């Protein structure tokens, strides 16, 4: 998730091209041990890395299961710029291996950000293999994913945000002897803003322009509706 975190900054949506909870080590999950190191043992300022291990979990629904796996991320931050690369690989359970090709689930991702002078801008690209779950609970054999976000913090409290999220599924529903199909599974623009009254309280609103084609949505069983959100947050 360390690479996806750079662009998972949208007002309401975002971060869902490939990262999701309880999907191997791509988000909040269970049965993991994590080691993080800052400034590379004190030798290189801004160079950080993390190593993660996840134990086998086969006692849940097939989309929430995982075999033994490991993950690694490395990031470097200097003068407002940040760069990160992440990779993870896990065994698939016997139930999962029956859906698509391969006994392993993998993801790699690269991201970059600029966070200075009241500006936040970030981009992320990543690919998954036998890992990403479609809306109809099938695993995608491969996905190609891109996310981008830009925001500006005004001194009077307004923080407008513009984000884009895209994910293309490749070779979907392929089986031995049967070729799969390609289809977009996520494709939208989010326009939104926060307004901060003080450090404890803010209001926000966002609109999601869903660009997903109905033909692609019919293949992946994804929604095509636009969405709107408004809310208020108070932090004690």
Outline where the language-model segments fall.
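C-terminal closing repeat unit and adjoining cap/tail of repeat-based domains
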Residues: 190-208, 212
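Short, aromatic- and cysteine-enriched interfacial helices/patches
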Residues: 41-44, 140, 211
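Outer-membrane beta-barrel "beta-signal"
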Residues: 33, 195-197, 223-236
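Mature soluble domains of exported/periplasmic/lumenal proteins and thiol-rich metal-chelating peptides
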Residues: 142, 184-186, 208-209, 213-225
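Outer membrane beta-barrel
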Residues: 1-56, 66-68, 75-82
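Outer-membrane beta-barrel architecture
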Residues: 44-50, 80-82, 118-120, 159, ...
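Detector for outer-membrane/organellar transmembrane beta-barrel domains
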Residues: 65, 70-191, 195
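Surface-exposed loop and membrane-interface regions of Gram-negative outer-membrane beta-barrel proteins
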Residues: 1-21, 55-66, 93-100, 177-180, ...
């Amino acid at each position: 998730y360390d690479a996806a975190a750079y662009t998972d900054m949208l007002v309401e949506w975002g971060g869902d091209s490939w990262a999701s909870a309880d999907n191997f080590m791509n988000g909040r999950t269970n049965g993991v041990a994590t080691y993080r190191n800052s400034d590379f043992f004190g030798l290189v300022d801004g160079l950080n890395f993390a190593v993660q291990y996840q134990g086998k979990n086969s006692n849940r629904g097939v989309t929430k299961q995982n075999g033994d796996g490991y993950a690694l991320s490395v990031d470097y931050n200097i003068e407002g710029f940040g760069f990160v690369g992440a990779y993870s690989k896990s065994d698939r359970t016997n139930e999962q291996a029956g859906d698509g090709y391969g006994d392993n689930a993998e993801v790699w991702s690269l991201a970059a950000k600029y966070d200075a002078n009241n500006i936040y801008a970030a981009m992320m690209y990543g690919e998954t293999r036998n890992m990403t779950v479609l809306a109809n609970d099938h695993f995608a054999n491969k996905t190609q994913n891109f996310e981008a976000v830009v925001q500006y913090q005004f001194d009077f409290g307004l923080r407008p945000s513009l984000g884009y999220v895209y994910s293309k599924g490749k070779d979907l529903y392929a089986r031995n002897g049967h070729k799969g199909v390609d289809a977009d599974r996520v494709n939208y623009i989010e326009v939104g803003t926060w307004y901060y009254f003080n450090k404890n309280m803010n209001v926000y609103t966002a609109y999601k322009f869903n660009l997903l084609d109905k033909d692609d949505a019919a293949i992946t069983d994804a929604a095509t509706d636009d969405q709107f959100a408004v809310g208020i947050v108070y932090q004690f």
